[in-house]
Amino acid sequence: MSTQVFHCRALLLRRLGETRASASDLTRLSAAQARAMASAAANGQLNGDHRGPRPLVLCGPSGAGKTSIMRKLTDEFQNTFGFSVSHTTRSPRAGESDGVDYHFVTKDNFVKLVEDGAFLEHAVFGGNMYGTSRVAVENVTETGKICILDIDVQGVKSIKKTDLNPDFVFIKPQRVEDLEPRLRKRGTETEDSIKRRLSVAAAEIAYGDTPGNFDIVIENYCIDTSYSQLRGFMLPKINALNIDMKGDDE
């Protein structure tokens, strides 16, 4: 690593709230990531005193199409976005891996993390606990990527009480009635869970439609059209990070 690049990275880390930077901290950023973060700083895209760009919060009722739209975003900009790995007390489903899909922990461990203030947001659904830790988000943003948080309205309300300062996007169906067939099509939901999800969907949509709660609200009647709206919202932020538009490494 050249002295010039080393000092550039040191400057970036100091600007992002670090008073000291060890050699291991500095080498964690590639030259491309350092340039991206420098561009972000110049264009106001850095997240306050946090290291890295502002995260992206995606919210909406289950079955509204968040995952499909999010997948199109990450497929197009492969090296621009990263996902935080949430904690949960539920058991792993077939094909899920600890540390990849979720951090699977016991209820006692989860409660201890809550008491320690480790979570930016946490909630209980279907008798299971879910939470997003600050460390999980920082692990992504420290690499110069935009961290995506896929959370519910309760989580959004909690995040708004923190200093995370993300962009908030709400994705909703045209009608609440559209959600039930989508949930059933998954084949992973029980009758009870479907009823629970539908019962809260109307309240979530009401919160999403309230002016000021989200930066943009997308009504998902067509995946391609909805993705175009999300892409248009995020593109200036992506450009400001100076990351290759095709997601290729420099």
Predicted regions: what is each one?
Residues 69-71:
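Post-Walker A alpha-helix
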